[in-house]
Curated annotation (Swiss-Prot):
UniProt modification remark: In low oxygen or sterol conditions, undergoes proteolytic cleavage by rhomboid-type protease rbdB and is released as soluble transcription factor from the membrane.
Segments of skewed composition (Polar residues): 267-291
Source taxonomy: Eukaryota, Fungi, Dikarya, Ascomycota, Pezizomycotina
Annotated region described as Basic motif, given as residue ranges: 165-178
GO CC terms: chromatin; endoplasmic reticulum membrane; nuclear envelope; nucleus
Membrane-spanning intervals of the chain: 428-447
GO molecular function (one): DNA-binding transcription activator activity
Main location class: endoplasmic reticulum
Expression induction: Expression is inducedd under iron starvation conditions and hypoxia.
Location of region: Helix-loop-helix motif: 179-236
PROSITE patterns cross-referenced by the UniProt entry: BHLH
Protein name: Transcription regulator srbA precursor
Intracellular or extracellular location(s): Endoplasmic reticulum membrane
Length: 988
């Protein structure tokens, strides 16, 4: 702020200039478009309380240049006098100027209102600062009335005492205040497009401005102007927000396009020559290749903004210009980077094209890298140059090395070659090359060997979502992430197998303590590694490895060698050896026999070692085996790992159906694969061997039932095998339940307890509560395929228990278990020739022996010999053709009207199954065994006074009637299809 005083900052006004200012002030007004003048006028109008040098009369014409500011900007002569005002109005008068001297006004009318000034503040010494803002005192002062408007504050500015001025009239103040508001509202009206358009239409001008979506105002009053201004502000806020969102989205998209362009530049560098991607530093218009580099240049808009960018900003790259120019034609922004699945043919072609394009790129990059290395290995240039190569090895120092003479070198070489050191080194190198080469050849065979190619009929087993195989695969995939098993790639697997082999050899030579000291493996790391490898090896042998190969089996068996020894790991390693060396070469060849012999020897060694370790461990030791595996370990390895079981174990490991490659004569072993109670590969081995032992025991029982000289010995062997099969089978698997139900059928001791255990393993009946049914079904570990046969066998055991309790006088059974009920169950046993299994056949066959041997019961009955069924044969045939299966039950009631066990029907059903059904071939039945069964059934019925031949005729007639019914049904179905075809042809 300028301070009063006499100096160079003050300017004096001549009377001529003052007269010219007064004469021009009557006809001038402030232009609306001049923002500077308007701001000055606004400042003067809002400071009317500080101006003391004006007359009180409001309507008087201005006599000084200070009255010019009170003219309304909307006056009619405002625009016409704007130029004159800008030319003649002196900008040297400060807005803070309040009290001019008396000599400043030529008229002298204001002498009574202004007190005389001192000499040093006269007309000759008065100065005004050009374009100075308001003083801090005047700007911060509030509006005052009455005696407060005495102008006493101006004394500090001019340092002179002024006389108090006369008060201004109130209407003048209000008029100027309203003029100020009207002017600002007029500016606000001109700032809103809709109001500006309405104003121009009212004045007769055409509205050329864009209203930006805002409707024009109907009446230009202050309220409408303010409301429209508020509406326009909200409209601008919404549009600004939308523009910000679009700007953000475009920035994100531009960033994505830059990333895509960088990726394409990186990928294109492998197929293009280095000169294509080289950017010249001399040309400023060149740019790096981008995703839009292939597009043609489209002429850009020749607007001033695009052709002449603002000065001082970073120049837009040409790649971005081409990208923006090509956007309207090729629409690159509309294409999504998310690639959806295409058709198989197109995807296969594109995949093959990508593979073909990658291989030359790799070769080209390798060749370029080789050239660069050779260029770096070149000799040093003779010319002096400041260029530096990429090779950091100081090869130029080799030129300074002085080589010995050729005579000395040849003599030293001959001396070294004749020494024993050279012979030892050469022998070691030859042996190493031989071993490594042999190992490499063996690994090539192991990597490419796949037993799936050896089988003619190969059907992939169906993948069940909730099967145990899926859980094993998840366990395998989880464990290999830590132990570092690579994918099925040649060099990766070769490296890992070789490293595991050296690790195994080094650990065997050094021992765990020295090995851990050398490698730095801690005890906690070793525990985690051991646990992970245990899970991985067991999951692989149980079929969890989907990419299994013999090289991976070698990898896991070497890893198993690095684990601490325990009985279970030794048993698993024995099975691992048999699976790894199973079927090496064609069956019957020398490689096949030698590999099996070597595998048996290794497995036998591991098995015996596990047996010794388990015998030395206490019962509560963490490494002690479960009861079923401990029982299995007591048996010889060659007796457990027979060819049939090893074939099924290999099929399980290689993800094949377990019955593939077998002789199809041991159907009891097929259920192990679908049994959810089998938790590991050793459990599967125990279940297979238990089922194999149970099947052999049942076949031995059929042979011993004929009553030969060795019958008693065979029965004892049979009972011991049944008990051993029960002890070996893992609980609660299907093999264990089968052995348990056979114990309940054949053994009188603890029969009721065994029946209760079998019933607990079976799901409840459908008539029970749904909640109990669902829980029992989920908790039951029995597969669905074995539930029917176990139910029939346990029913036979219950019938045998009832008859045994009647013979011995035992009253421990419930009162509802009567002999009549047992006979009713026996007569209604389901003996379907197609669905009957070996387990059901053995249970019914033994029950037939129990009932036929009860002579006292047959003698005490009303009729020991039932009537012949031949008299009812014709009625049965007629009823079978009409009523079907309902008539079959009626025929049985006609044959045996008395509550007697229908021994003839059961015996004839068993004989028919042994003769004609195809199921016995799956269980190892021979022709001699079939003859033994026929003879035994016939003799049992003859002892009871029943002729099996009559029932056999009925059985044959029944089978013929069933065949006739089936043929009639097929014929009726064919007629219906023919009639349907005729109807369709008629309609067409």
């Amino acid at each position: 702020m300028s301070t009063p005083g006499i100096g160079g900052d003050f300017q004096l006004f001549s009377p001529l200039e003052s007269t010219r200012r007064i004469s021009q002030g009557n006809s001038l007004s402030v232009d609306q478009s001049s923002t500077d003048v308007a701001s000055q006028d606004w400042t003067q109008w809002m400071r009317w309380d500080d101006e003391q040098a004006f007359p009180e009369t409001a309507n008087a014409s201005p006599s000084s240049p200070f009255d010019l500011a009170f003219i309304s900007p909307s006056a009619s002569s405002g625009r016409e006098a704007s130029d004159a005002m800008h030319k003649d109005f002196s900008p040297d008068i400060s807005l803070d100027f309040k009290s001019p001297s008396l000599g400043f006004f030529p008229g002298g009318d204001l002498n009574t209102n202004v007190s005389p000034q001192p000499d040093h503040v006269g007309a000759g010494s008065l100065s005004v600062h050009s374009n100075s803002p308001l003083s801090s005192i005047g700007a911060s002062r509030k509006r005052k009335t009455g005696s407060d408007d005495d102008g006493s504050t101006m004394t500090s500015m001019f340092k002179a005492k002024q006389a108090p001025s006369k008060k201004r009239a109130h209407n003048v103040i209000e008029k100027r205040y309203r003029a100020n508001l009207n002017e600002k509202i007029a500016e606000l009206r001109d700032s809103v497009p809709s109001l500006r358009a309405s104003y121009k239409q009212a004045n007769g001008n055409s509205g050329d401005d864009d209203d930006d979506g805002v409707t024009s105002a109907s009446k230009l009053n202050k309220a409408s102007i303010l409301s429209k201004a508020t509406e326009y502000i909200r409209h601008l806020e919404i549009r600004n927000k939308r523009l910000e969102e679009e700007n953000t989205a475009l920035k994100i998209r531009l960033r994505q396009l830059d990333k895509a362009a960088d990726q394409i530049v990186t990928s294109a560098a492998s197929v293009s020559s280095p000169s294509d991607c080289t950017v010249s530093t001399e040309s400023g218009a060149s740019s790096s290749p981008s995703v839009f580099s292939h597009a043609e240049d489209v002429p850009s808009d020749h607007s001033p903004t695009s052709s002449h960018p603002p000065e001082g900003l970073i120049k837009v790259p040409d790649a971005w210009k081409r990208m923006r120019a090509a956007g309207s034609n090729e629409s690159p922004y509309s294409q999504s980077y998310i690639q959806y699945k295409k058709t198989d043919s197109h995807s296969s072609q594109s995949g093959g094209g990508r593979m073909r394009s990658h291989l030359p790129n790799k070769y080209m990059l390798g060749a370029l890298a080789g050239l660069m290395v050779l260029e770096g290995l070149g000799t040093e240039k003779k010319t002096e140059s400041t260029a530096k190569g990429l090779l950091a090895v100081p090869l130029n120092l080799l030129n300074r090395v002085q080589l010995p003479s050729e005579v000395y070198s040849s003599a030293a070489f001959q001396y070294f070659w004749s020494s024993w050191h050279a012979r030892a080194i050469s022998h070691f190198l030859m042996l190493a090359i031989l071993v490594v080469g042999s190992a490499f050849i063996v690994f090539v065979y192991l990597f490419n060997s796949d037993p799936r190619r050896q089988y003619s009929a190969s059907k992939v087993a169906p993948d069940v979502t909730l099967s145990s195989c899926n859980f094993r695969r998840q366990a395998w995939l989880t464990s290999i992430q830590r132990v570092g098993v690579p994918r099925h790639r040649f060099f990766h697997e070769w490296y890992v197998v070789t490293s595991r082999c050296f690790e195994y050899v080094l650990r065997c030579l050094l021992g765990w303590k020295l090995y851990s000291l050398v490698t730095g493996v801690t005890e906690e790391d070793e525990k985690g590694r051991v646990k992970t490898w245990d899970i991985a090896i067991d999951a692989q042998l149980a079929g969890g490895d989907a990419e299994i190969s013999k090289s991976r089996l070698v990898l896991t068996i070497f890893a198993a060698g690095t684990l601490p020894r325990s009985p279970m790991r030794m048993m698993l390693k024995a099975l691992h050896c048999r699976i790894l060396m199973w079927r090496v070469g064609e069956p019957g060849s020398w490689t096949f026999n030698v590999s099996n012999d070597v595998a048996r020897s290794l497995a036998r060694y591991q098995w015996d070692l596990a047996r010794k370790m388990n015998a030395a461990l206490p019962k509560d030791h963490p490494d002690s085996l479960p009861s079923h595996l401990a029982t299995l370990l007591k048996i010889d390895c060659d007796d457990v790992m027979i060819d049939t079981i090893i074939q099924r174990a290999a099929n399980l490991t290689w993800n094949r159906p377990t019955q593939e490659g077998t002789d199809d004569d041991e159907a009891l072993l097929d259920v192990v694969e679908e049994d959810p109670a089998i938790q590991s590969s050793l459990d599967a081995l125990a279940a297979w061997w238990s089922s194999h032992l149970l099947q052999g025991a049942l076949l031995r029982y059929f042979e011993a039932s004929s009553g030969g000289p060795d019958a008693k010995k065979s029965r004892n062997v049979f009972k011991s095998k049944i008990k051993l099969a029960l002890d070996v089978a893992p609980q609660p698997s299907a093999a264990h339940t089968r052995a348990l139900v056979m114990m309940a059928v054949f053994f009188e001791r603890d029969r009721v307890a065994n029946i209760g255990s079998v019933l607990a393993a079976l799901p409840k009946e459908k008539g029970k509560n749904k909640q109990n049914q669902a829980s029992n079904f989920l908790d039951s570990s029995l597969p669905i395929s074995v539930r029917e046969e176990i139910s029939t066998a346990v029913r036979c055991a219950m019938i045998a228990a009832i008859f045994n309790a009647r013979a011995t006088g035992d009253t421990s059974l419930p009162a509802t278990f009567t002999v009549e009920k047992a006979i009713h169950w026996f007569n209604r046993l389901p003996l379907d020739p197609v669905e009957l299994t070996l387990l059901e056949f053995a249970a019914v066959y033994h029950l037939l022996h129990i009932l036929a041997s009860d002579i006292d019961y047959l003698a005490s009955s009303d009729s020991s010999a039932p009537p012949s069924p031949m008299s009812k044969a014709s009625d049965m045939l007629s009823s079978s053709s009409d009523d079907g299966e309902d008539g079959a039950s009626q025929r049985n009631n006609n044959i045996i009207p008395h509550p007697m066990p229908n021994l003839g029907r059961v015996a004839s059903e068993l004989i028919y199954w042994a003769r004609n059904a195809y199921n016995p071939a799956f269980y190892g039945f021979t022709s001699n065994l079939v003859k033994v069964i026929e003879t035994e059934c016939t003799s049992l019925c003859q002892t009871a006074g029943v002729h099996v031949a009559d029932y056999s005729c009925v059985q044959e007639e029944k089978s013929k009637a069933k065949q006739a019914i089936d043929s009639k049904r097929r014929f009726a179905g064919g007629n219906e299809e023919a009639s349907d075809n005729l109807l369709l042809s008629d309609e067409s």
